[in-house]
């Protein structure tokens, strides 16, 4: 569309410029000729130029209307802000045509819609990223939960032991209890993970979500300040006796905890051994029963097999006897057949000889 507008604008401007040069050149270049002719020509040229200007204005208005309609349709279809092709095209359009108030209003409305959509998309993307980060932190906490629980138990035991040592060593002195940097970092890490796991629950897309985020940021800042204060306090504290007592207390607490765990595991081992012995006795009983059943089944199978084999032998012997009898009967039958054939032949000869004798006797009588 922009290229078509440029081509049309350039062609109309060039024609108009040529007409202006023709109209002005006749009056300036030939001052010595007749004024009547010049006046007539200038009038005819002026009339033609006005008619051409009117036609061009009509064409421009039609093109502007078509372009505005096309822009409105494009904005409605794609909901985008109309982009300007180049600075020269904008200047030419501004010089040729005045801005349309309807087009301005549509552009402002489209800009407001685009800005609202952009804000909504950015807020949704930000909330989705936060939810993903919280879910990842929750998964990490679930993976390392046992380590964190062990660290919490160790830190609580160390706190109790440190309090007892402080009471013993510093009776009558009101000094603040010092916590080691490692214990504090462990506690801080655990508290962070618990907060992240609590905040990783399904979030509602409302103002309360951002308020919770602000509260979490405030808590993190307070925690960082406390950490800095404790690091400064541990750096300025130069008495090695409490640290030694803390180390001894930590070792004693660990030893006691390990002893308790060993006793508990020994009791579990004894219980498991008793269970294993019971199952071994049951296994032996079941094995003996299975052996007896196997023997019985094998004996029964052998008996059945022996009976079947005997029956097979008997049937085979009977079959052989029957085959022998059938063969003998077949031979006797063949012999009888041969005898019958011989007798039939003799009978036929005898009957033929008798007929011949009867025929000869009447001939002799004649």
UniProtKB/Swiss-Prot annotation:
Residues 20-105 are annotated as: Disordered. Residues 1-95 are annotated as: Interaction with IRS1. Residues 39-50 have a biased composition (Polar residues). GO terms for biological process: positive regulation of insulin receptor signaling pathway; signal transduction. Residues 46-77, 129-160, 250-299, 326-353 form a coiled coil. The keyword Magnesium does not apply. One of its GO terms (molecular function) is identical protein binding. Keywords: Coiled coil, Golgi apparatus, Phosphoprotein. Its main location: Golgi. One of its GO terms (cellular component) is Golgi apparatus. The modification Phosphoserine is found at residues 23, 25, 27, 106. Belongs to the GKAP1 family. Interacts with PRKG1 and IRS1. This is G kinase-anchoring protein 1. It comes from Rattus norvegicus. The lineage of its organism: Eukaryota, Metazoa, Chordata, Craniata, Vertebrata. The gene is Gkap1.
């Amino acid at each position: 569309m922009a290229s078509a507008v440029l081509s049309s604008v350039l062609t109309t401007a060039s024609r108009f410029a040529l007409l202006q040069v023709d109209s002005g050149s006749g009056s300036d270049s030939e001052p010595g000729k007749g004024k009547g002719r010049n006046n007539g020509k200038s009038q005819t040229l002026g009339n033609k130029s006005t008619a051409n200007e009117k036609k061009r204005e009509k064409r421009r208005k039609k093109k502007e209307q078509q372009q505005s309609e096309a822009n409105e349709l494009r904005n409605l279809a794609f909901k985008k802000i109309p982009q300007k092709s180049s600075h020269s095209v904008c200047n030419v359009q501004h010089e040729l045509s005045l801005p349309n108030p309807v087009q301005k209003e549509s552009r402002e409305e489209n800009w407001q819609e685009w800005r609202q959509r952009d804000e909504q998309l950015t807020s949704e993307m930000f909330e989705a990223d936060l939810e993903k980060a919280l879910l990842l932190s929750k998964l990490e906490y679930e993976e390392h939960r046992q380590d964190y629980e062990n660290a919490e138990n160790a830190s609580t035991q160390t706190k109790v032991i440190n309090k007892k040592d402080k009471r013993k060593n510093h009776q009558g002195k009101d000094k603040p209890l010092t916590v080691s940097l490692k214990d504090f970092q462990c506690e801080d890490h655990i508290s962070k993970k618990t907060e992240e796991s609590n905040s990783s629950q399904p979030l509602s897309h409302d103002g309360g979500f951002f308020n919770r985020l602000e509260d979490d940021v405030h808590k993190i800042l307070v925690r960082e300040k406390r950490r800095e204060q404790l690091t400064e306090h541990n750096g300025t504290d130069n008495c090695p006796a409490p640290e030694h007592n803390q180390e001894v207390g930590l070792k004693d607490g660990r030893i006691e905890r390990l002893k308790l765990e060993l006793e508990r595991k020994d009791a579990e081992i004894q219980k498991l051994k008793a269970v294993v012995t019971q199952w071994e006795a049951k296994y032996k009983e079941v094995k003996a029963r299975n052996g007896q059943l196997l023997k019985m089944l094998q004996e029964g199978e052998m008996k059945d097999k022996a009976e079947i084999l005997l029956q097979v032998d008997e049937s085979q012997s009977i079959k052989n006897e029957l085959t022998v009898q059938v063969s003998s009967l077949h031979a006797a039958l063949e012999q009888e057949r041969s005898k019958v054939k011989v007798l039939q032949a003799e009978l036929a000869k005898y009957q033929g000889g008798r007929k011949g004798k009867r025929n000869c006797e009447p001939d002799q009588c004649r």
